[in-house]
Each structure stands twice: as structure tokens, then as C-alpha cells.
Amino acid sequence: MQALIEISDKQYLVKAGDKIFVPKQKAAAGDVIEVKTLMQVNQADSALKAGTATIKVLEHVRDETIIVFRKKRRKRFQKRNGHRQHMTQVEVLSL
């Protein structure tokens, strides 16, 4: 069974046992969180229903570096910045 869950205004299509990266959550590593499911899809009877999903916070990490490069032509102005977004890895325990 798959479910469409919403975490921090983003939607993810997951099933039990999946590990996904989501925007940083305030929960500590090892905590269990309940999130709402927008829709559960069961291939056997094609039933659509809402409910809750249980996820476990595995760790807090930082995403890959995104390079931001700005340049003004003919003025010898160049600026290069890097940005790393904070992410949380979670595991879906049950739907």
C-alpha cells in the first residue's frame, strides 16, 4: 500500500519502510512523529482514504552544495556563494 503524505508543505508518495529526506524537522534523532496522509492507495481494491502515518527521525544532515554565481558584465564584478540546506532523514514505519 502506498500513501501520499504531507510534511512541511511538501508531498511525498511513500510506502512502509521507505527512507526519505525532508526539510529539517524540530524533532530529535530517534523520535517518532505522526503525520497526516492525504490519500492512501491500495492496489487490491483501489480504495482511497485519509489517515495518519508514523515516521521515525533517523538523522539530521545537510544537502549537497548549490552554487550561486552572480556577475555584472563589463564591471569586473563576480560573486560566488554556496548554500547547503538542512535536511532530516526519516523512515516510514507504518501507514
UniProtKB/Swiss-Prot annotation:
Source domain of life: Bacteria
Ribosomal protein as UniProt keyword: yes
Entries under InterPro entries matching the protein: bL21-like (IPR028909), bL21-like_sf (IPR036164), Ribosomal_bL21 (IPR001787), Ribosomal_bL21_CS (IPR018258)
One GO process term, biological-process aspect: translation
One GO MF term: structural constituent of ribosome
One cellular-component annotation, GO: ribonucleoprotein complex
Keywords: Ribonucleoprotein, Ribosomal protein, RNA-binding, rRNA-binding
Keyword Nuclease included in the entry's annotation: no
Intrachain disulfide bonds: none
SUPFAM superfamilies registered for this protein in UniProt: L21p-like
Chain's role: This protein binds to 23S rRNA in the presence of protein L20.
SUBUNIT field: Part of the 50S ribosomal subunit. Contacts protein L20.
PANTHER family: 50S RIBOSOMAL PROTEIN L21, LARGE RIBOSOMAL SUBUNIT PROTEIN BL21M
Family affiliation: Belongs to the bacterial ribosomal protein bL21 family.
Protein name as catalogued: Large ribosomal subunit protein bL21
Native organism: Chlorobaculum tepidum (strain ATCC 49652 / DSM 12025 / NBRC 103806 / TLS) (Chlorobium tepidum)
Name of the gene this protein is made from: rplU
